[in-house]
UniProtKB/Swiss-Prot annotation:
Domain comment quoted from the record: The N-terminus of helper component proteinase is involved in interaction with stylets. The central part is involved in interaction with virions and the C-terminus is involved in cell-to cell movement of the virus.
EC number annotated for this UniProt entry: 3.4.21.-, 3.4.22.45
Family annotation (InterPro entries): HC-pro (IPR001456), HC_PRO_CPD_dom (IPR031159), HC_PRO_CPD_sf (IPR042308), Pept_S30_P1_potyvir (IPR002540), Potyvirid-P3 (IPR039560)
Record-level GO cellular component terms: host cell plasmodesma
Signal peptide: none
Annotated Peptidase S30 domain residues: 165-308
Annotated protein name in UniProt: P3N-PIPO polyprotein
Species lineage: Viruses, Riboviria, Orthornavirae, Pisuviricota, Stelpaviricetes
Entry annotated with the keyword Cell cycle: no
Length: 1024
């Protein structure tokens, strides 16, 4: 294919002009007869024309879309005119709509005239004649008479100022006089150059300086603080020369408050960053270097510079401006200046610190901290500060009576608070948590609003008035008590929705089989099983556990149904229980608060009002069954050794409620929970407590452990005949026909503890048991046994540290405890865990030291009795999760009361018989200490003999025969030192003693003797 280029256009010839065809055409062209214009030229012209048309069409199509898009702009630009802006920029200026309309109307008129002319009838001109006689005459445009102007001529006369022309000397003299006048009258001076510079004369340290206004005085931190041209600089230097410009400044004389001062840089002793050597305009200091205001600094340096501005003056100016704007405009007298200005400033500062205490008035953190404080925090923190400022103003500024009156009122307003918390508590207790209906809701709201005291807002006052109005309306409308509803209309159906126990649904507390994992709770639950449950001996059968006796009757368990038969008929008989006496729904089944039923504290009924009677409850093995009125949930009991089965002791069935609460207890609180139940609640509940006492105990636990409020209860059966509640455990119930209590959670059971609840069931008994009383003598014996047994002592220190206080019953026990180092070890253990226990053990150590100084037993007991009151006050501190705590408190209180009584008797001249009895107690306890010490000495002797035997066996073989006798003497002396007993020589011993002690003197048969000592050591350890 051939290509021909026309200018910038490239033409590709088609196949007709191939190279072969071109050669053939060229040969033909060389012939003379074919020298005319060939077809090749025509083809080239056609191809070129085609390319040009293609280019033009492509160009037109390329610009067509843009032209259509910009057509509105072109149409608008048609009526725009070009203008020239600054720097020769020419642009279009849009015309107004009025101008465009006028232009379009003119174009329309012209087009219309042209159209009428073109389309009008033809006019034929036959001839054109010219009158040559008449010459063309110029006719002037007719004169238009101008109307007279009636405008008033301006009377303003243009003033033309004559230019002031001065010589250099006259100008200098003029500026000096201006400077002298400004200096004398304190006027500002403005120097107008490229930029305006304002200055004035000011006094600092009895010296007059010329001061310019720099930009950082306005609060900004620019890079250039002041810009001066050369002419302004000369004038500024002339004004500075009229002040103490040439004063020599020592190091440190340029201080804050001198921003903008014009000084001589030659007379400055401080290191400085100068702009030139003619002037130095103070800006501030950066890294101990003075900075000139004209010097350019970076943005970082401008923030780091310590500017020498005068904040006090700015504060004074701001205070003055605001005071003048806010002062009273209308007064009944003429205001005069009677008080001292400085004292006014002092009092203003006192008032400022009283209202808004702060470290610095410019500190943003102080302002934010104060703004975030509540009214209670402000009152608690600053009430004493306000009182101090009031006292200062009263002592130093008594003439400011109005300020004293303001501070007094402000302090009284700050202290307006309702401190009658006792009445608030009583009202809340009398109303209770469940009374949400009127008028109790209004009373509760008024009680909550009044307790706020001075913190009540205007909205609170409005709400209190509204509630009081409702109470007045209620009291007005109530003319008689609401008639109580009939028992026949009482309905208390089971809820259709099952209670959701989130503790049993949490994946983190379930194992792979979906069973509840007790974790650390399993270990601490043993306190319940060890004290309140019996282990079922399967070999004896289940029959002995079927009948459960109570103070008012019996109930049969379904534990015998654990033995099941393969005979279906016999198995169906196990589904039949033993029917109890049938009771209809009566007042005994209901609980009321006021005139309303408290349904969770009532028995469950059917839809027709008949009571829901319990059916046979099948037993399970090692399960805790929770869920009272809903579907029961089976939780595996903590695992026991050998898969033993536990059953609550007679009267202990209510412990299952506390065991169910343990499910909701956090693992780290399980120890304190179980100890609180064991040591605090169960001793108070005693045997067969009432439901009211049990509910109160549950409320006590719910306060300490709020997560137990939604713990599910085991099924509780109501026996109205025996007036007793039965808490059903995993062994079910064979007795049927009892009523069922509706309460399903601990929070619902707590309602029985309210005094406002009218219910006969509050006095019903619940299963319980009596814990063995703490025996002081047994505990003292345990303490004596642990003195010389480190393992037992360690267990005592960790689990029952208050048992150490029982040593005050005997001086011998106290000193033995001190000499063994147990008190010191207890102090070291508890010093980082409980400061109270560490202080108690330290007091016992100090008491033991004082007791050791007394010579007689009565004197030792007197020392202990004198310190019993101090120990009692230190020990008694609320409730502690230790069994020995209450025992120690009671012991110390008894000793304290006995000592006070004995002092009274001694003062009256009576003798006390007790002085003859301490030796009897000491005689009873001292053998235990001696026996323990003898066992320790015996073990020590055995270990000593074993050590000496090992030494003798090892080293006598290596000695020379002549030196063995000397070695025997050395070993004999070592034994006498260790065992504190003199050892006889072998020559003076009997044959039996020689055989017994032969190990000490001869290495013969040492292995046999060692074996005999090992056997004796085992015997001693067993019997000690």
């Amino acid at each position: 294919m051939s290509t021909i280029v026309f200018g910038s256009f490239t033409c590709h010839l088609d196949a007709a002009i191939h190279q072969d065809n071109a050669d053939r055409l060229a040969k033909a062209w060389t012939r003379p007869e074919n020298r005319q214009v060939s077809n090749v030229h025509l083809l080239c012209r056609r191809a070129a024309k085609s390319l040009i048309n293609t280019y033009e069409s492509a160009t037109a199509s390329a610009w067509k879309g843009l032209e259509e898009k910009l057509q509105p702009m072109f149409a608008k630009r048609e009526f725009s005119k070009t203008v020239t802006k600054r720097k020769g920029l020419r642009c279009f200026k849009e015309s107004s709509e009025k101008f465009i309309e006028k232009k379009l109307r003119k174009q329309y008129q012209e087009e219309r005239e042209r159209f009428q002319f073109v389309n009008g009838p033809d006019a034929i001109v036959n001839q054109i004649s010219v009158d040559k006689c008449e010459a063309s005459v110029w006719v002037p445009f007719p004169h238009i008479i101008e109307k007279p102007s009636f405008a008033t001529p301006s009377m303003k006369k243009k003033v033309v100022f004559t230019k002031v022309r001065m010589s250099e000397a006259s100008l200098q003299l003029f500026m000096r006089r201006v400077a002298a006048n400004a200096k004398a009258n304190g006027q500002k001076v403005e120097i107008i150059g490229r930029k305006r510079v304002v200055g004035n004369y000011t006094t600092k340290s009895r010296l007059t300086y010329f001061r310019t206004h720099v930009r950082h005085l306005d609060g900004s931190k620019p890079r250039y603080d002041l810009v001066l041209d050369e002419a302004t600089k000369k004038i500024l230097q002339l004004f500075a020369n009229t002040s103490r410009f040439h004063h020599v400044h020592k190091k440190g004389e340029v201080t804050p408050g001198m921003s903008g001062f014009v000084v001589n840089p030659i007379n400055l002793s401080d290191p400085m960053q100068v702009y030139d050597t003619d002037l130095f305009i103070v800006r501030g200091k950066h890294n101990s270097i003075l900075v000139d205001s004209r010097c350019k600094v970076s943005k970082k340096q401008s923030n780091e510079i310590i500017h020498y501005s005068d904040p006090g003056k700015q504060f004074s100016d701001g205070f003055t401006n605001s005071f003048m704007q806010c002062k009273l405009r209308e007064t009944d007298h003429q205001s005069t200046s009677d008080l001292d200005v400085k004292e006014c400033g002092d009092v203003a500062a006192l008032v400022c610190q009283a209202i808004i205490p702060c470290g610095k008035i410019t500190c943003l953190q102080c302002a934010q901290k104060y703004s975030y404080m509540s009214q209670q925090e402000i009152r608690d923190r600053f009430s004493t500060v306000i009182e101090q400022h009031e006292k200062t103003a009263m002592d130093n500024y008594p003439q400011f009576s109005h300020v004293l009156a303001f501070l007094k009122r402000y302090r009284e307003l700050m202290r307006v608070e309702n401190q009658n918390y006792e009445a608030f508590k009583d009202i809340t207790h009398m109303i209770g948590e469940d009374r949400k209906e009127a008028p109790f809701s209004h009373l509760q709201q008024i009680n909550e609003l009044i307790i706020k005291g001075g913190m009540m807002s205007a909205q609170d006052y409005i709400e209190a008035s509204d509630h009081l109005r409702e109470l007045a309306r209620y009291q007005k409308n109530r003319t008689e008590n609401i008639r109580s509803g009939s028992i026949k209309a009482f309905r208390n159906k089971i809820s259709s929705k099952a209670h959701v126990n989130m503790q049993l649904m949490c994946d983190n507390q379930l194992d792979t089989n979906g069973n509840f994992v007790w974790g650390q709770r399993e270990y601490h639950a043993k306190r319940f099983f060890r004290n309140y449950f019996d282990v079922i001996d399967v070999s004896e059968g289940y029959r002995r556990h079927i009948v459960r006796e109570n103070p008012r009757g019996i109930r049969k368990l379904a534990i015998g149904n654990l033995v099941i038969s393969t005979n279906l008929a016999a198995l169906r008989k196990q589904l039949l229980g033993e029917e109890c006496i049938h009771f209809e729904v009566s007042k005994e089944c209901t609980s009321r608060r006021g005139e309303n039923f408290v349904y969770q504290c009532c028995c469950v009924t059917h839809e027709d009002g008949t009571p829901l009677e319990s059916e046979i409850i099948s037993p399970t093995k090692n399960h805790l069954v929770v869920g009272n009125t809903g579907d029961s949930k089976y939780v595996d009991l903590p695992t026991a050794k050998g898969g033993a089965m536990f059953i609550a002791k007679a009267g202990y069935c209510y412990i299952n409620i506390f065991l169910a609460m343990l499910i909701n207890i956090n693992e780290d609180e399980a120890k304190s929970f179980t100890k609180t139940v064991r040591d605090t609640l169960v001793p108070k509940l005693g045997t067969w407590p009432s439901m009211m006492d049990l509910a109160t105990a549950c409320h006590f636990l719910a306060v300490l452990y709020p997560e137990t409020r939604n713990a599910e209860l085991p099924r509780i059966l109501v026996d109205h005949e025996a007036k007793i509640f039965h808490v059903v455990d995993s062994f079910g119930s064979l007795s049927t026909g009892m009523h069922v209590l509706k309460a399903n959670t601990i929070n619902q059971l707590i309602s029985f503890a309210s005094d406002t609840l009218d219910s006969n069931m509050k006095t019903y008994l619940v299963g319980g048991s009596e814990v063995d009383k703490c025996d002081e003598f047994k505990n003292v014996k345990l303490l004596i046994r642990s003195i010389y047994k480190p393992q037992i002592m360690e267990q005592v220190l960790k689990e029952e540290p208050y048992l150490l206080l029982m040593s005050v019953l005997s001086p011998g026990v106290l000193m033995a405890l001190f000499n063994s180092g147990s008190l010191e070890k207890a102090t070291q253990y508890w010093i980082t865990r409980s400061h109270t226990l560490a202080a108690i053990t330290s007091m016992l150590s100090a008491l033991a030291a004082k007791v050791s100084l007394a010579s007689t037993l009565n004197a030792q007991m007197s020392v202990i009795d004198e310190h019993a009151a101090v120990l009692c006050d230190s020990v008694f501190d609320g409730t502690k999760p230790y069994a020995s705590y209450m025992m120690a408190v009671k012991t110390l209180e008894r000793m304290k009361a006995r000592t006070e009584s004995d002092h009274t008797l001694n003062d009256l001249g009576f003798s006390v018989l007790r002085q003859a009895t301490p030796h009897l107690v000491e005689k009873k306890l001292s053998p235990g200490i001696g026996a323990s010490l003898e066992r320790v000495k015996l073990v020590g002797k055995i270990l000593c003999n074993l050590g000496i035997a090992a030494v003798a066996k090892t080293y006598t073989k290596t000695f020379h025969p002549k030196r063995r006798r000397r070695f025997r003497r050395q070993v004999r002396h070592l034994r006498s030192v260790i065992t504190w007993q003199p050892v006889q020589t072998p020559e003076r011993r009997s044959p039996t003693e020689k055989r017994r002690c032969g190990l000490l003197y001869t290495p013969v048969d040492g292995e046999a003797i060692l074996q005999s000592h090992r056997n004796f050591h085992k015997f001693s350890s067993k019997h000690s």
